[in-house]
Amino acid sequence: YLDLPSVFDMPKEAAEFAYKCSGKLWIEAFQVGYFEEAHDYDLVSSFPSIARNLIDIRQLEWIQSSKYQSNAVYGYCKCDVTIYDFVMVHPILTRDEQGNLIAPVGTFTEFLTKGELDFIDKWKIGEYKILEGWWGIAK
């Protein structure tokens, strides 16, 4: 059998936060002009390709903290997020009242990964306050 990590290898609350950070897949296609040939890449195969390089969560110590943990491998946080008004396009997604995924400017509360927080900081597109967070830190 395969000895793979599962959701049961992390604290239940951390797994719940991770779940709330998921389900925001952003896929778009644009065409300007005419193309004789177009390609549709196999996204289904891309997920296992990425998953094979993920860190085994059984090798992490999980801590709960509202302070950003720069040394964490994974982080899942509930945040108050502000995306600045001048930002035209960004990947920080939330759902509107009808359940549609949107990438708004302004302030909203959302569950974000450490990677999303790092993106906000790197590109200076906004700011955030971590209300609650779960962090996986290498042992």
Regions found by a protein language model. Give the residues of each.
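Conserved acidic
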Residues: 1-139
